[in-house]
């Protein structure tokens, strides 16, 4: 089984891909899809669409976990929601089962507290995946935490 965890954004979409093999969690890939601020918004959304399609075609995940978006008073709210829509559309078009989790759910599942710090979540990601150094950038570590939340729900803790 392979899962892709996704931390949505317009400037940066974090992703993490984990495989379960012989009851062991194996990190296959993680990183970010970055879109340049100098580009028009529609071009940035298309870049997310294109790059996410390529990732999925390459890694062929069976499951997807996406962080739920909470509305904040911000000038980027609509852009992030649009990027999330593109992400959900790509996953649905590939017939990948999608689960969504709030930040508090992810923190609770991964670090044991819905109010866990970034460092506590990062430490839990490193522990769960037996990593010697933290995944970079932070958006990819967040995406791995999202994927691990789904795996925990599936019984792989």
UniProtKB/Swiss-Prot annotation:
Q: Where does Mg(2+) 2 bind?
A: 67
Q: What does the entry's cofactor note say about binding and number?
A: Binds 2 Mg(2+) ion per subunit.
Give the record's GO biological process terms.
DNA recombination; DNA repair
Q: Where do the annotations place Mg(2+) 1 binding?
A: 7, 139
Catalytic residues (UniProt): 7, 67, 139
* SS bond list: none
What does the record give under GO molecular function? crossover junction DNA endonuclease activity; DNA binding; magnesium ion binding
Q: Which GO terms describe its cellular component?
A: cytoplasm; Holliday junction resolvase complex
InterPro entries in the record: RNaseH-like_sf, RNaseH_sf, X-over_junc_endoDNase_Mg_BS, X-over_junc_endoDNase_RuvC
Q: What is its main location?
A: cytoplasm
Q: Which cofactor does it need?
A: Mg(2+)
Q: Its function?
A: The RuvA-RuvB-RuvC complex processes Holliday junction (HJ) DNA during genetic recombination and DNA repair. Endonuclease that resolves HJ intermediates. Cleaves cruciform DNA by making single-stranded nicks across the HJ at symmetrical positions within the homologous arms, yielding a 5'-phosphate and a 3'-hydroxyl group; requires a central core of homology in the junction. The consensus cleavage sequence is 5'-(A/T)TT(C/G)-3'. Cleavage occurs on the 3'-side of the TT dinucleotide at the point of strand exchange.
Write out the annotated subcellular location.
Cytoplasm
Q: What is its EC number?
A: 3.1.21.10
- Could you describe the subunit structure of this protein? Homodimer which binds Holliday junction (HJ) DNA. The HJ becomes 2-fold symmetrical on binding to RuvC with unstacked arms; it has a different conformation from HJ DNA in complex with RuvA. In the full resolvosome a probable DNA-RuvA(4)-RuvB(12)-RuvC(2) complex forms which resolves the HJ.
Q: Which Pfam families match?
A: RuvC (PF02075)
- For the protein in the UniProt heading, the enzyme class is hydrolase
What's the protein name? Crossover junction endodeoxyribonuclease RuvC
Its family remark reads: Belongs to the RuvC family.
Q: List the transmembrane segments.
A: none
Query: What keywords appear on the UniProt entry?
Result: Cytoplasm, DNA damage, DNA recombination, DNA repair, DNA-binding, Endonuclease, Hydrolase, Magnesium, Metal-binding, Nuclease
Q: Reaction catalysed by this chain?
A: Endonucleolytic cleavage at a junction such as a reciprocal single-stranded crossover between two homologous DNA duplexes (Holliday junction)
């Amino acid at each position: 089984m392979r899962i892709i965890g996704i931390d949505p954004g317009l400037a940066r979409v974090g992703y993490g891909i984990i495989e379960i093999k012989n009851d062991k969690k194996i990190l296959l890939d993680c990183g970010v899809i970055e879109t340049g601020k100098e580009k028009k918004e529609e071009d940035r959304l298309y870049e997310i669409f294109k790059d996410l399609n390529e990732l999925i075609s390459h890694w062929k995940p069976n499951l997807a976990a996406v962080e739920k978006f909470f509305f904040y008073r911000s000038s980027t709210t609509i852009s992030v929601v649009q990027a999330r829509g593109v992400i959900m559309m790509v996953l649905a078009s590939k017939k990948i089962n999608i689960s969504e989790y709030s930040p508090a759910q992810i923190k609770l599942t991964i670090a044991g507290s819905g109010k866990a710090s970034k460092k506590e979540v990062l430490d839990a990601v490193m522990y769960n995946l037996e990593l010697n150094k933290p995944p970079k950038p932070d958006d990819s570590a967040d995406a791995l935490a999202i994927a691990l939340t789904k795996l925990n729900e599936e019984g792989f803790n």
